[in-house]
Amino acid sequence: MSLKDRFDKFIEYFTEDGDDVQVAESRVQQQAVKPSNSRPAQQEPVRDIKQPRLVSSSSQHVTNTPSSNENITRLHARQQELAQNHSVATSEKVTIDVRYPKKYEDAPAIVDLLLANESVLIDFQYMTEVQARRCIDYLDGAKQVLMGNLRRVSGTMYLLTPVNVVVNIEDIKLPDGVHSEFDFDMKRR
C-alpha cells in the first residue's frame, strides 16, 4: 500500500458526506498556491531536501515535549486541587449535565465541562453514526488526558465523569448483550 493511499484513507476517516467536495476544492487551491517560478539550476535532489526536514521536525519534537509535560503536570495538579476541594465540601449537590450533541463541533463544549470537573451524560441520538464515532473518539482522547472515565449507559448514551467521580456500573441495569465498557462500535446496541 502506498503512502498516498494511507493518507487518503486517513483523510477519508475524518470526512463526512458533504466534506468530500471541500477536500477536493482545498487540494486544488493548494496546488494553485504553490510557486511556479523555481529555477531548475538551484533545485537539489529529493534526498537532500527530505533529510533537513526530518532533522528539524525531530528537534522541534524534542523542544515541544517539556512544555507538554509541564502542561500535563499543571493540569494534574489542578485536578487534584479540585478533588480535594470537592471532598471537603461534601454538602454540595452534585449535578450531571445532559447533552444532546447534534454535530461533531459540539464535542469541545463537552470536554470543557469535564475540564471544569463536571459529569456529563451524552446522548448521541441526534447524530449520524459516523459523527457519533468521531465525537466518541474525541471524547476518549480528552478522557485519557484529563484522567476521566467514559462509560456506556445505553445504545446511544455515554457517561463522561472526572477522575474524582466513581460510577458503580452494576447499579445501572443494562439489558443483556449491552456492555458498559467503552467501545467505538456503536452498531452493537
Swiss-Prot record:
Could you confirm whether the keyword Cell cycle appears in this record? yes
- Gene that this sequence comes from: sepF
Where is it chiefly localized?
Answer: cytoplasm
The role this protein plays is:
Cell division protein that is part of the divisome complex and is recruited early to the Z-ring. Probably stimulates Z-ring formation, perhaps through the cross-linking of FtsZ protofilaments. Its function overlaps with FtsA.
Stated family: Belongs to the SepF family.
Q: Which UniProt keywords apply?
A: Cell cycle, Cell division, Cytoplasm, Septation
Composition-biased stretches, type Polar residues, lie in: 27-41, 54-70
> Which residues constitute the signal peptide according to the record?
none
What's the protein called, per UniProt? Cell division protein SepF
